[in-house]
Design a protein with these regions (language model features):
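Membrane-anchoring hydrophobic helices of lipid-metabolizing enzymes
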Residues: 1-93, 99-110, 114, 137, ...
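A near-ubiquitous, low-amplitude feature marking generic local secondary-structure context
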Residues: 4-8, 17-18, 30, 34, ...
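Soluble catalytic domains of membrane acyltransferases
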Residues: 58, 67-279, 350-353
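Soluble or luminal CAZymes and related metallo-dependent hydrolases
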Residues: 64, 160-164, 295, 299
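C-terminal structural cap/anchor segments
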Residues: 258-324
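Long, low-complexity C-terminal extensions of enzymes
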Residues: 295, 307-382
Length: 382
């Protein structure tokens, strides 16, 4: 397929790009080290041969990514499933979800789509702040990622957003791909998931017709992702204290790398994906004459309601809310054993935090809020 040249800097690698990209990857020492770590018993030549046999991005995902993610979920989760009864696996959609884990939110979704009979996986929106190493950028583009450019001037940001939106519309309409995009820029560190209006505004820059028609062309599906345990909870809490105590503190590239590694390999308990109905029909019920900002706010609120109301809540979520509010209002949702297990887990996560002036009470409150907020949001939809 002929891809417009304007997308060259952000699009995933296409099948015709793959031979050259594979050669680049296979000659990179860091990539070789990763392969040696992941496949200690397999000769490099055999992996190279298997990689070069992949003619499409989906071939690569089925040959490498699928088994890798399945292996992670087997070791670091007690189960992972997706409820997609509300959507049609013969169609393609833009999944817009809450964002917990840098890598696995979208990687596990790909596995779930394959397991649920979808004809293809997702093209994934990923920020260029996570792609400082050229070989990592190559690898994610092989794995069907398209790039969201960050840290731009206002003028550059407008041009970049328009190109990004045009590409998303092209991927859905012309390439017949699915797309995954987070409902906000970056993870919601406190798990209080809210759709950023700016994401919807960006998506409505591409396509044709009114705002409602443009968003309908992307076939948006609100997706709720629920992890029983977030392996990065202690890192997120640590970040809160660093931001509080150190003026102008900012994450470095190593922080993202540690979060990615911890998120992939850390224990997650149960993981659940729930796809709400595609919002095309809902969009048809809206008044197209509504003022633009009100329209975006209304659509964002609908997405939030769908995501919040379809969370899978675990006993630990209710324990966290009761501990935070010093009550037993939700004690019917957990047993004394559940509570003891969760409190032990929290103590273990707090013990991992290394800080010079460690504020235990503040850190504990932040971690508990991460587990309590999904309950608050879920209850607010009832």
């Amino acid at each position: 397929m002929k891809i417009p040249q304007e997308f060259d800097t952000i699009r995933p690698w296409e099948p015709e790009d793959l031979p050259e990209v594979f050669d680049r990857l296979l000659s990179n020492d860091q990539f070789k080290q990763v392969l040696a770590y992941l496949y200690p018993q397999v000769p490099f030549e055999m992996i190279a041969q298997k990689l070069k046999a992949c003619k499409t991005n989906l071939d690569f995902q089925l040959a490498f990514a699928y088994d890798f993610v399945q292996g992670i979920l087997k070791k670091a989760a007690t189960g992972c499933e997706m409820d997609c009864a509300a959507i049609d696996n013969t169609r393609n959609y833009t999944f817009i979800s809450n964002h917990r884990d840098i890598v696995l939110d979208s990687a596990s979704l790909d596995v779930m789509l394959i397991d649920n009979g979808f004809k293809t996986t997702c093209e994934i929106a990923i920020g260029d702040n996570l792609l400082s190493l050229p070989w990592v950028k190559d690898l994610v583009r092989v794995n069907k990622a398209f790039i969201v450019e960050r840290a731009l001037s206002m003028r550059q940001m407008l041009m970049s957003s328009k190109r990004l939106s045009d590409y998303m519309h092209f991927a859905i309409k012309e390439k017949n791909e699915n797309i995954w995009i987070a409902q906000r820029e970056g993870r919601a560190k406190d798990s209080d998931d809210r759709t950023q209006k700016s994401i919807l505004q960006m998506m409505a820059m591409g396509g044709e017709g009114s705002i409602i028609e443009r968003l309908k062309q992307l076939h948006l599906v609100p997706l709720s992702i629920s992890y029983e345990y977030d392996p990065c909870d202690f890192l997120k809490a640590k970040e809160y204290q660093q931001k509080r105590d150190v003026e102008g503190w900012k994450k470095g590239p190593m922080d993202d790398l540690i979060s990615m590694q911890t998120g992939i390999f850390g224990y997650k308990g149960h993981v659940h994906y729930h796809a709400a109905p595609c919002i095309d029909e809902y969009l048809d019920t809206l008044d197209p004459e509504m003022p633009k900002q009100e329209l975006f706010n209304t659509i964002a609120a609908h997405l939030d309601h769908e995501i919040h109301s379809h969370y899978r809540l675990y006993p630990g979520n209710y324990v966290a809310l009761d501990l935070l509010e010093n009550t037993e209002a939700h004690a019917s949702e957990y047993t004394p054993e559940d509570k003891a297990r969760f409190e032990k887990y929290i103590a273990g996560q707090l013990a991992k935090i290394q800080l010079p002036d460690k504020d235990e009470a503040f850190l504990k409150e932040k971690i508990l809020a991460m587990y309590a907020n999904p309950v608050r949001n879920f209850l607010a939809t009832k």
